Design a protein with these regions (language model features):
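Beta-strand/loop substructures that line and gate deep hydrophobic ligand-binding cavities in soluble
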Residues: 101-151, 158
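Solvent-exposed, polar/charged alpha-helical surfaces in well-ordered, non-transmembrane soluble domains
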Residues: 43, 47, 53, 147-150, ...
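Hydrophobic ligand-binding cavity/cleft-lining segments
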Residues: 17-67
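Glycine-rich portal/gate segments that line the openings of hydrophobic small-molecule binding cavities
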Residues: 37, 54-57, 64-107, 158-163
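A short, structured loop/turn motif at beta-sheet edges
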Residues: 39-43, 88-92, 111-121, 163
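Bacterial N-terminal signal peptides that target proteins for export
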Residues: 1-10
Length: 163
């Protein structure tokens, strides 16, 4: 079972908790999964993109580690001076992060999996609660996020394949 799938299942396994610890009403959860084939071995591809603030380059914005150690569980990053995310899980070739804003309870996983000894695949999974987004804006929001992360994967792929 993929790391992102396991985390999503754990999130849905019981009532979500707010920062105060009280039960939250059921949400409207969405998962967006993007994949990209990479012409590089998995370990080499991961080595090129594993930095927790590398996302700043992929999104063409700023990113800074504001707490903890880069790449370690518990590290907190701030993207574009406003979005704060914490690493909640990691493996040798992946990490999962969560937004600390409980409004949409989003988390994402970036992972690389081997396909052959010389090729691999990036998988970027975003999972979030769209209940706080007005119903008439949800489809456009999902489309915007999917396009943004498709661009992120294209940038990651280029970095991983660069000599």
């Amino acid at each position: 079972m993929k790391l992102a799938t396991m985390i999503a299942a754990a999130t849905l396994g019981g009532a979500a908790l707010t920062s105060a610890g009280s039960a939250k009403a059921a949400g409207d959860y969405v998962s967006i999964v993007q994949e990209a084939a990479v012409n590089a071995p998995a370990a080499q591809a991961w080595d090129k993109v594993k930095g927790y603030c590398a996302i700043g380059a992929w999104l063409k914005t700023t990113c800074e580690i504001t707490a903890g150690k880069d790449g370690e569980v518990g590290a907190l990053r701030k993207i574009a001076g406003r979005v704060e995310e914490v690493i909640v899980a990691k493996t040798a070739t992946s990490y999962t992060y969560a937004d600390i804003n409980p409004a949409i309870l989003y988390h994402g996983t970036i992972e690389v999996v081997p396909v052959t000894p010389k090729t691999s695949k990036f998988i970027y999974t975003l999972f979030f609660d769209q209940a706080s987004i007005p119903a008439e804006q949800r489809e456009a929001n999902r489309t915007r996020r999917a396009a943004m992360f498709a661009n992120v994967l294209a940038t990651m792929k280029a970095a991983a394949e660069a000599k």
